[in-house]
Structures are given as structure tokens and as C-alpha cells.
Amino acid sequence: MDVKKLLADVTALPGVSGHEAQVSAYFAEQFRPLVDEVTVDAMYSVIAHKKGNGPKIMLCAHLDEIALMVTHIEDDGSLRLGNVGGVDPRILPASRVW
């Protein structure tokens, strides 16, 4: 598995909190050749099951990303933003937004 490619692929997908479907689908496809069964639930959690008697493991991680949402456009073109997810306001000054 090419970890560099995996990271590049997954970070290019939109995955804002509440809209993780594409990220979930990507990971489901990555797991599919390695396990016996893959399901994605209503909350976009990916559950992969490999049959056998070996030790059980669980990988638990967030699939969503934090984001900013435009809540208002001022007359001068400047934007008012609201956060989606856990944006720490201390990191916002001098942060590039695109």
C-alpha cells in the first residue's frame, strides 16, 4: 500500500462534518480486498470484518474534517465565517483560507 498516495487521495476528498460520504466510500473500497465484509452505516462509519480466530483489532478515527462556512458577505466583499466542527479560533489569525 502506498501510504503517500492514500493520504493524498483522502485529503483531496470533501469530508466536512456531516458530509463524509465520499471519504467513507473511499475507505470502504480500500478495505474491501483485505476483508470478508465491509459496510457503511447511516453515520458514514466504515465497518470492516475479517473472519478468523486471530486477535481482534479496532481502528477508530474521525473521517470528517473541520471547515469554515461563509455566513454573510459584506457590501465591501469581506466575508463572515462560521465554523463547522471544532475549529480552534486561536489558529485563525494569519491563517490562509481557500
Residue ranges and their predicted role:
Residues 1-98:
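N-terminal hydrophobic/helix-forming segments and targeting peptides
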